Amino acid sequence: MAERSQHLQDVFLNTVRKQKISLTIFLVNGVKLTGIVTSFDNFCVLLRRDGHAQLVYKHAISTIMPGQPVQMFEGESSE
């Protein structure tokens, strides 16, 4: 069976989704969003905060900052 390569953004988003890590997302227009990733696909990220959901298109995202260190790969030390 062919092995599917994983993109870094998919590994990162899936890790913060599973661990429910709060994120700060900056958009290209300067808007700052905070919340927890509940789902994502190739084109967008579903962000939840205070019971409200926001669908954010990836092409509008400039920077993503997690609220705590993220260990994406086994054996990786979090410093």
Swiss-Prot record:
Q: What keywords tag this UniProt record? A: RNA-binding, Stress response
Stretches that traverse the bilayer = none
Q: Could you tell me which residue ranges the Sm domain spans?
A: 10-70
Q: Is-annotated flag, keyword RNA-binding? A: yes
Does Cytoplasm count among this protein's keywords? no
Which Pfam families does the record cross-reference, listed alphabetically? Answer: Hfq (PF17209)
- PROSITE patterns found in the cross-reference section: SM
- What's one GO BP annotation on this UniProt entry? regulation of translation, ncRNA-mediated
Q: GO CC terms for this protein?
A: cytosol
Q: Which GO terms describe its molecular function?
A: RNA binding
According to the record's subunit comment, the protein's assembly and interactions are: Homohexamer.
The family annotation for this protein states: Belongs to the Hfq family.
* HAMAP family, A to Z: Hfq
Q: What does this protein do?
A: RNA chaperone that binds small regulatory RNA (sRNAs) and mRNAs to facilitate mRNA translational regulation in response to envelope stress, environmental stress and changes in metabolite concentrations. Also binds with high specificity to tRNAs.
UniProt protein name: RNA-binding protein Hfq
What is the species of this protein?
Answer: Bartonella quintana (strain Toulouse) (Rochalimaea quintana)
